[in-house]
Every structure is written in structure tokens, then in C-alpha cells.
Amino acid sequence: RICSMTQKERQERSRKEIYQAALEEFGTYGYDKVNMERICGNHGISKGMMYHYYSNKDELFLLCVERTFQELRAHVERDMAHLSGEDTAAAVKDFFMIRERFFQLHPQQKLVFESAMLRPPKHLAAQIQALRAPMRRLNQEFIEGLIDKMPLRPDLKPEMVTRYLETIESLFQNMIVSYQGGHPAQDFHAMLETAGELLNMVLFGILRHADPA
């Protein structure tokens, strides 16, 4: 079968092999601990083939980031369709949990995502934000639709709440782990319960409001 491959098929096969190797390395060790030699050595890829397609680890890291954003966006779009009939608090929780469900299924992409969003290499920050733009637009559109249904405090503008929920969404996994004392949830059901507790406080606050006189 390999001998009968066209040149295009061989190129696609080589690129896929390199991508899978890079994803495994970046998705296990993060950006800083990975280099081209490590990827080649750990996965039996010749340096000649590697450098024929990619000139440095930044290209490979950005490829992993781009694919992660693309696959996460497709996953979120697919599951978002089921949230339209929910009340706003439940929809916010389930929207946040869509992403966590994706990362439970794809733990290597979870570390790539966290490396890109929480610990981005400074020289790649602008490119990462550009790659994230379609995902961010999807988040904004959904959050803005939710906010239209929310009885907001009179001192809050919708754009402020959009930025707030976007910020919470990007940090939500770390918030869950921290809230649980640094220990990840044992299963998805436990994570859902924790998410519900956290979002109750995020959305409704922790201070008892004084009764009107």
C-alpha cells in the first residue's frame, strides 16, 4: 500500500505522523520542555522528514493549538444546539461543561489549550490570539444570547457581563480544581456538581442582600 501511494498521500501521511507526535509531546510536557530533537527521537521520525515539513517547534506548537481550537469549536457548536431551551443558569453551567467534556475525552489537547491560554510563549501570543478568534466569536455570540435573557443588575452593562463570563469560561477548569482543594474531580458527575456550586456563586454572588426597608 505504501509503494502505491501518490506523492500527495505520502505527504499527508508524513504530516499526520508528525502532528500526532507533536501533539503527544506538547500535550504531555507543555511547550517549554519540548524540542524538535525530542519529537524525532521519541517517535522514530527522521530529522530530514521533520525539517522538510516544519522548520521549528513553534510551527508545530501553533499547529497543535490551531487543531485544538478547531476541534473544540466543532464540539461546542454541536453540543450548543441542545442548550437553547434551558433556563439561563443551567445553560451557562452546561455551556461551560461542554468544553470540560471535550477535554476529558482529549487530555493531550487540554494541556495544549492550557499552555496556549494560560502560559503562552510571549513571542507567539499574537498568533495564538488570532487562532483563537473563531472560538472566541462563538463564545461571545452564545453568551450575548444568554445575557439578553438575564435580569441583570441595573448598574451592569451587557458588554461588561460578556467580558466577565468570557473570563470565567477561560479559567473555569482551574477554578474547579482549586475549589476542590487542588484535587481533580473523580468523575464527570462530581465535576458537574462542583460546577453547579461554583456557578451559583459566580452568577448570584455570595453576599446576602439587605431586605428593602
Task: Report residues per predicted region.
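Helical hydrophobic small-molecule/effector-binding pocket
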Residues: 93-115, 140-141, 166-177, 204, ...
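Helix-turn-helix
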Residues: 13, 17, 21, 25-59, ...
